[in-house]
A protein has these predicted regions:
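Cytosolic/stromal cytosol-facing helical appendages immediately following the last transmembrane segment
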Residues: 1-24, 54-58, 89-90, 106-117, ...
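The first (N-terminal) embedded transmembrane alpha-helix
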Residues: 21-44
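Core segments of transmembrane alpha-helices
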Residues: 29-37, 118-136
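Transmembrane alpha-helices and immediately adjacent membrane-cytoplasm interface residues
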Residues: 66-74, 133-137
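Transmembrane alpha-helical segments that form the membrane-embedded catalytic/substrate-channel core
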Residues: 69-82, 151-172
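Membrane-helix interface/capping segments
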Residues: 76-110
Length: 248
């Protein structure tokens, strides 16, 4: 996600507030992902259909559940690291990733004003190094468990920022409310904990399903101690309470 003050308008590229070159990369990333994901998804469906029995269905459901759990955990890891390690000046990731998370805590509602491309394109982009080899070179599409796991994992990864946006949006579509109520995707009430002092837990933003367990086992304090230690070498400073902004 990018934030600046001047808006650019284009019939082809939409409305955006950052360099046109970045906008083009974002749109191309989404388009490339859509093509390769469709191919991989069809292979996954075929793999499940070719050996459809009770065991296959059970493994498929298990794969989907594990994929959701992993996607949620990964979202929390990325979120926590970007909140607490490095700075906007960190090479490679500073401007593209860390900046978005830091600015989100200054103005949590900024992402609700962004369009689909601005909010989600980064996640489409980071999936391509996994998706493209799976389609072109790796024979994982023929395995029902592995293919289902990857299809569901990438689906949740690419929509994580959209889910996060919904958690900050007052009015969302009925189906989204249904998913939020059943904790399939992140709910506003659950996410509000992260925007409440001391701002040091509930980093997972896909469904939030892993937050209670990670909090109970004391995972976040350990990770934050690591960030403070690593920060001595990598530079930067964590987001502080005064920069966390208003609640969810």
């Amino acid at each position: 996600m990018e934030t600046t003050t001047e808006l650019s308008h284009s019939r082809l590229l939409g409305t955006y507030s950052y360099p046109t070159s970045h906008r083009v990369i974002e749109i191309v990333s989404i388009a490339v992902f859509a093509v390769f994901y469709a191919v991989f998804g069809l292979r996954a469906v075929a793999a499940v259909g070719d050996d459809l029995d009770v065991a296959t269905v059970g493994l498929t459901v298990l794969a989907a559940f594990l994929a959701l759990v992993l996607a949620d955990f990964l979202s929390g890891m990325v979120h926590a690291l970007c909140d607490n390690l490095g700075s906007v000046d960190t090479p490679v990731v500073g401007q593209k990733f860390i900046r978005s998370f830091r600015e989100h805590h200054t103005d949590p509602l900024d992402m609700t004003r962004g369009d689909f491309v601005r909010v989600n394109a980064d996640n489409f982009l980071v999936c391509l190094p996994i998706l493209i080899p799976c389609v072109l070179w790796l024979n994982v599409g023929s395995n029902p468990f592995v293919s289902t796991f990857l299809v569901v994992l990438m689906a949740f990864v690419v929509v994580t920022n959209q889910i996060h946006k919904w958690a900050h949006t007052d009015q969302v579509p009925g189906p989204v409310q249904w998913l939020q109520a059943r904790r399939i995707v992140l709910s506003p009430d659950h996410h509000r904990v992260h925007h409440t002092p001391p701002y040091d837990s509930h980093y997972c933003i896909t469904s939030g399903v892993t937050n209670p367990l990670l909090t109970k086992v004391g995972f976040w304090p350990v990770l934050l101690r690591f960030c403070r230690w690593a920060g001595r070498f990598l530079g930067g400073s964590p987001a502080t309470g005064s920069s966390q902004g208003p609640g969810a």
